[in-house]
Amino acid sequence: MRFSPSLEQGRLLRRYKRFLADIELASGEQMTIHCPNTGSMLNCMREGGQVWFSRSNDPKRKLPGTWEISETPQGRLACVNTGRANALVEEALRAGTITELVGFTALKREVAYGEEGSRIDFRLEFEGAPAYVEVKSVTLGYPDTAVAAFPDAVTQRGAKHLRELAKLARQGVRAVQLYCVNLTGIDAVRPAEEIDTAYAQALRAAVADGVEVLAYGTRLDAEGIVIDRRLPVLLTP
């Protein structure tokens, strides 16, 4: 995924009302940009920290700028635009980068499924046998470790998705939880037990029921983002 044009850089002044952020450009100009992330953005939101944003030429947009990347306190880069994860994964699926999911004959997005009113990110068809793939974007890192964690806040919705995947797996349907790690300098992923114990327990239960868990890392900068490597998932605390 290439950013065209390249991202512009600024300094974060504040984030507020969930969807808004004020930044200062190198020229000293201040502007308000859209924040496409409804989560806590723990570790990705530091006043005075460097941020990168895309700029739209659409005259109908009230805010032309969209926050894309943050520099974390550890000096890593994190893609905070959660909408990028599914696009990155689809790009990688079609390119054959995610080797565990190579060979599908059709791809459908946002397919309704399950008993709790869920929508799966991707349904892949493999010679008549489907695979259901749920994508989560990972941006939470910690000092002195190259292990990222998910989630960065309590997520009942995330636990619901794991329950739905587990039900599919128990029925013999291929079900996959895929973590897209949009954070540089990471070698592995784990559930953030210290933030959401219920999610961590749901993940381990889903694996016991047959859900496949995959994690892939990205390479990212102001020019673009690409999924480039498989990462291990550490399930035990």
Curated annotation (Swiss-Prot):
InterPro entries: SfsA, SfsA_C, SfsA_N. Coiled coil: none annotated. One of its GO terms (molecular function) is DNA binding. It comes from the Bacteria. Gene3D superfamilies: 2.40.50.580, 3.40.1350.60. CDD domains: SfsA-like_bacterial. Belongs to the SfsA family. HAMAP family: SfsA. This is Sugar fermentation stimulation protein homolog.
